[in-house]
Amino acid sequence: MVAERADVLPALSEVFREHGYEGASLALIGQRTGLGKGSLYHFFPGGKEEMAAAVLAEIDSWFEQHIFRPLREEDPRRAVPGMVRSVDGYFRSGCRVCLVGAFALGDVRDRFADAIRGYFAAWTDALAQGLERGGLAEDAARDRAEEAVAAIQGALVLARALDEPGSFHRAMARIEARLTAP
C-alpha cells in the first residue's frame, strides 16, 4: 500500500526506464503504481514533470550515498572497487537502463538539464577526487574519471543492445583495472 510519496518512486522509476518520459502516460503510471489520477496529483501536484524530477532526485540521492560520497571520502583503494560493485548492482549487471542517461539523450534533456548535468558532473568530480587522492595527477585523474563514466554508460548501452550482461561485467572489470592502475 502506498502511504507516502516516496513509496511511489520505485514504480515511477521503472515506468520511466521502460517507456521514457513521453511514453509514460498517466494511465500507465496509475496502472503500475496502483494509484488513481487524484492520488498521483496529491503526491505530485506538478504532474508527470514533478514525478520525473522526484525520480531523478531519488537517483541522485542513491548515487550520492553509495558512490559519490565514498569516492570523495574513503580510501580510493576501497572506494573505486566499491563503486564498480555498486554500479554493477544498481544497473543489474547492465540489464537496467540508466534513466539519467536516457533522459540526457531524449527530447526531455532541456527540461531536466540541471539534474542531468549535476548527476554526471558529481560522478566525474567524485571519481576524479578519489583518483587524485590515490596519487594521480589532477589532469590524469580527471581524464580517467571522464573516461570511466563514459565507458560505464557505453557498457550499459552495449549490454542492453546485445542482451548480454556478460559484456557489462567484462567492461566493468576493465574499467576497474584502468582506474586502479598506477
What is each stretch, according to the model?
Residues I67-R96, A145-A148:
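Hydrophobic alpha-helical connector segments
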Residues M1-A3:
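N-terminal intrinsically disordered/low-complexity leader segments
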Residues E64, R109-G135, D143-E146, R170-T180:
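Amphipathic alpha-helical packing segments from all-alpha helical-bundle domains
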Residues R78, G82, A102, D143-A150, ...:
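Amphipathic alpha-helical interaction segments
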Residues G89-Y90, L105, V149-S167, T180-P182:
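Amphipathic C-terminal alpha-helical segment
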Residues A52, A79-G82, F91-D114:
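Amphipathic alpha-helical segments used for helix-helix packing
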Residues L56-W62:
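Short, basic, alpha-helical segments at the C-terminal edge of helix-turn-helix-like DNA-binding modules
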Residues D7, A11-A54:
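Helix-turn-helix
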